[in-house]
A protein has these predicted regions:
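H-loop (His-switch) and adjacent beta-strand-loop-beta switch element
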Residues: 186-203, 211
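ABC ATPase nucleotide-binding domains
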Residues: 209, 213-232
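H-loop/switch region of ABC-family ATPase nucleotide-binding domains
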Residues: 177-178
Length: 232
């Protein structure tokens, strides 16, 4: 049983409570729920970004996170320097980084802009660099908070294709999503979070069905299902 608490203006609140979860090779877990349910907090606890106040977490394998990708960048350093710096933070050796530098640069499509400090980059350019470096590893466990939506359409399409490849190759996938379609399409398990607790766990279709009935009512839920998910 894991608990994660954080500070608010009124003191300590429980962001996650009574979370018990075990994932094995081949598992693809969708985490769904309303805003403020604790979805992103749970993902960050899994990534060991947030410490827990009670319980334990056991992780076996290399984790890659597709959120907060800008962490670890030096705004005064050039794009090239940040590729190497971020690579080290991702657990790559200097030799491994050098083998990946060219591919990272080509994927980012930043060209000569890699020679200048990233503080001069537009938000779109920075996303290109951060994404290109963060997805250069081959993780055992992939933690993903939605899909990429920022940046120009061409790069977003290319980036989402890479994410799809990583989702297929990772031994374990954990996907936080507001898309019920993605939960069913990509995952074989799902949990519904509400107020930091697991309200429902099981097959994605069953969990999505429960969630839709909870927020919309049974009639609207059945109409929605007939139009989208259960025509597959």
């Amino acid at each position: 049983e894991n608990k994660f608490s954080k500070m608010s203006g009124d003191g300590v609140i429980k962001a996650l409570n009574k979370i018990t979860l075990e994932l094995r090779d081949g598992d693809r877990l969708a985490i769904i729920g309303p805003n403020g349910a604790g979805k992103s907090s749970l993902l960050k606890v899994m990534a060991q970004i947030y410490p827990i106040s009670k319980g334990e977490i056991e992780v076996s394998g290399h984790i890659a996170t597709m959120f907060e990708m800008a962490t670890g960048f030096d705004m005064e350093a050039s794009g090239w320097e940040n590729i190497r710096l971020r690579g080290i933070m991702l657990g790559l050796t200097p030799k491994e980084i050098e083998l990946k530098v060219k591919e990272i640069a080509e994927f980012s499509e930043l060209g000569d802009y890699l020679d200048i400090p990233v503080k001069y980059y537009s938000s779109g350019m920075f996303i290109r660099l951060a994404f290109s470096v963060s997805t250069s590893v081959d993780p055992d466990i992939l933690l993903l908070d939605e899909v990429l939506s920022a940046g120009d359409a061409g790069f977003v399409d290319k980036a989402n294709k890479r994410i799809n490849e990583m989702m297929k190759s990772a031994k374990i996938l954990v996907l936080v999503t507001h898309s019920m379609d993605s939960a069913i399409k990509f995952c074989n398990k799902a949990i519904l979070l509400k107020k930091g607790k697991i309200l429902k766990f099981g097959d994605p279709k069953n969990v999505v069905d429960y969630y839709l009935k909870m927020i919309w009512g049974e009639f609207i839920c059945n109409e929605y299902k007939s139009e989208r998910y259960y025509k597959r």
